Amino acid sequence: MSVKLKYDKIDQRNGDDSGGNHNNCGNGNNVTIVIKIQPQQQQQLINERQQQHQQQQQLINERQLLQQQIQLIKQQPQQQQPMNHTTPPSPHHLRFESPNDVPYIVIKAV
């Protein structure tokens, strides 16, 4: 597969700086650039682009979920959440005796 790009030099005769399309100048300054892309390279580029798009979409979805969770937390009544401990919490309950005994902090939105 090859892609042709046509590049027209701006014709500056008679002080023309309009920047318009000068295809019909007939001054022979047209330059054609040919870029050859191998089929496997093309497929790899397509795959990379799709992967980037999927990652971007995933980040957008995660952000929306987090915003929804923040809204839900803000709407909840401001009360202390019960702690789900297997043993009653105590001041010296900071020793980690088993994975079930790990204390946690309840974070509330203000």
From Swiss-Prot:
Spans annotated as Disordered: 1-29, 73-100
UniProt feature, compositional bias: Low complexity: 20-29
Domain of life: Eukaryota
Annotated Basic and acidic residues bias: 1-16
Protein name: Putative uncharacterized protein DDB_G0271558
